[in-house]
UniProtKB/Swiss-Prot annotation:
GO terms for cellular component: cytosolic large ribosomal subunit; extracellular matrix. Transmembrane segments: none annotated. Belongs to the universal ribosomal protein uL2 family. Residues 211-235 are annotated as: Disordered. This is Large ribosomal subunit protein uL2.
């Protein structure tokens, strides 16, 4: 009988495959949409720029005045390039066009670089949140209340003109261009994420450890496609693949 393979151990969600999340600072998100943001703006100040383990982009701790006296509203935002401690951040319909401010995308001119864009009104930011990412406003349709934006992938998407976005590019760009240089850095990088590293290839294992293992030289020896309803210990390689082989031709992006 074969051993339990790596894919089965991942599904068990043991400590080896679980992300080390106890050091994380929190979920970065916009303020909950309220009357003040819909009709005017609210003013906050950046208290500190912090590192969040497992995330490439730095975070900014922003403090707004609370709804009641002597109470502060502390928020965690994804920091754009150029944001600094002591900077004032304005969020709302009548905020100025400055890096770090949060406005409805319908109020921003075409060609504006934005990040942390709401996909749906009130979801507090869902698109263009990774380090160095940004989206671009392509056009507005005031009749339908829709704005067309260009996503980091290059594709275009229509979102509500009332959806909010932060002006600027997410900080930390070029992070992946810096080489690791040693295995220890890769170890610590993957340790805080839910990834297993280093990953041993199946053909390098013994036949008792993996369906691709064994042989007088490293080769699979059979087709790597598997059925959707195969048992867990057999589902490796290309699972329920519609097609195999190289992708030929160019990808057409609809305007």
């Amino acid at each position: 009988m074969g051993r339990i393979i790596r894919a089965q151990r991942k599904g068990k969600a043991g400590s080896v495959f679980g992300a080390h999340t106890h050091h994380r600072k929190g979920t970065p998100r916009f303020r909950a949409l309220d009357y003040a943001e819909r009709q005017g703006y609210v003013k906050g100040v950046v208290k500190e720029i912090i590192h969040d383990p497992g995330r490439g982009a730095p975070l900014a701790r922003v403090v707004f005045k609370g709804l009641t006296q002597f109470k502060l509203d502390k928020q965690l935002f994804i920091a754009p390039e150029g944001m600094h401690t002591g900077q004032f951040v304005f969020a709302g319909k009548k905020a100025t066009l400055t890096i770090g401010n949060i406005l409805p995308i319908g109020k921003l001119p075409e060609g504006t670089i934005i990040c942390n864009v709401e996909e749906k009104l009130g979801d507090c930011g869902a698109v263009a949140r990774c380090s160095g990412n940004y989206a671009t406003i392509v056009s507005h349709n005031p009749d339908e209340g829709v704005t067309r934006i260009k996503l980091p992938s290059g594709s275009k998407k229509n979102v509500s003109s009332l959806a909010r976005a932060m002006i600027g590019i997410v900080a930390g760009g070029g992070r992946i261009d810096k080489p690791m240089l040693k295995a220890g850095r890769a170890f610590h990088k993957y340790r805080v994420k839910k990834n297993n590293w280093p990953k041993v290839r199946g053909v390098a294992m013994n036949p008792v450890e993996h369906p691709h293992g064994g042989g007088n030289h490293q080769h699979v020896g059979h087709a790597t496609t598997t059925k959707r309803d195969d048992p867990a210990g057999k589902k490796v390689g290309l699972i329920a693949a519609r097609r195999t082989g190289r992708l030929r031709g160019t990808k057409n992006i609809s305007e």
